[in-house]
A protein has these predicted regions:
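Flavin-dependent oxidoreductase catalytic core characteristic
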Residues: 1-227
Length: 227
């Protein structure tokens, strides 16, 4: 949808015309926008269903959330000695995103209890964190399988795609987590949790500009997205 909107802008007034190449893409993009209403409902239901199962004892979220809170009181693990290949940083990021979600969701449940279901903004923040986790973990695991099959060199561009996505996802998780925490916590409690969130959304620097240029060049050469 973003690419379509940018394409329409590039062609200016002609962007909506059948004489320009963007008209079909713009019509197709309308389908996604119709789905957006349903997606908004599903975002709310994602967290709602998760919390209902936790409250009924079907899944144990609070124990994991309490473990994360306990970890915050310990000395940070800087990952010394960890080596999981080219995706070491990304695999660690996925694990930390899970902890960030548990930190925010656990604190929200403890603080708001049954009132949480009425706090749609907080539910949306947590849902967006979960969505980014799902996409991040899925992309990393899928890339791992490809690397095991064809090797790192053959999967170089896919590696850059995943690293770029993870970099963006971690930033979004940090922002959503921060907005959620600031909605129900304050004072020293808020400062402590924000420090914890920062700890779990820390990522080694990666040059996303060069990666995006390499990705764009490949797409331009192939005249399509062939990954």
């Amino acid at each position: 949808d973003y690419v379509t909107d940018e394409g329409v802008q590039i062609y200016g007034g002609m962007g909506f015309s059948a004489d320009a190449p963007m008209d079909r893409s713009y019509r197709d993009a309308r389908i996604n926008r119709i789905f957006e209403g349903t997606n908004e409902i599903n975002r709310l239901l994602t967290v709602d269903q998760l919390l209902k199962r936790a409250m009924s004892g079907k899944i144990d979220i609070m124990s994991a959330a309490m473990a994360v809170q306990k970890e915050l009181m310990s000395v940070p693990d800087f990952g010394a000695g960890e080596d999981e290949g080219v995706l070491t940083n990304e695999l660690k990021a996925v694990r930390n995103i899970k902890k960030a979600i548990l930190l925010v969701a656990g604190a929200a449940v403890q603080k708001l209890m049954n009132k949480l279901k009425h706090e749609q903004e907080i539910l949306m923040n947590i849902a967006d964190m979960i969505i980014d986790l799902y996409a991040a973990e899925s992309s990393v695991l899928r890339l791992q399988k490809k690397i095991d099959t064809v090797g790192e060199e053959a999967a170089d561009l896919e590696i850059q795609i995943v690293k770029t996505f993870i970099s963006d996802a971690v930033e979004r998780v940090n922002i959503n987590g921060k907005h959620a925490l600031q909605s129900f916590a304050e004072g020293d409690e808020l400062r402590m949790m924000l420090m914890g969130l920062k700890r779990y959304t820390k990522l080694d620097p990666f040059n996303t500009k060069n990666a995006r240029r390499a990705i764009a060049t490949k797409i331009s050469e192939d005249q399509g997205y062939k990954f």
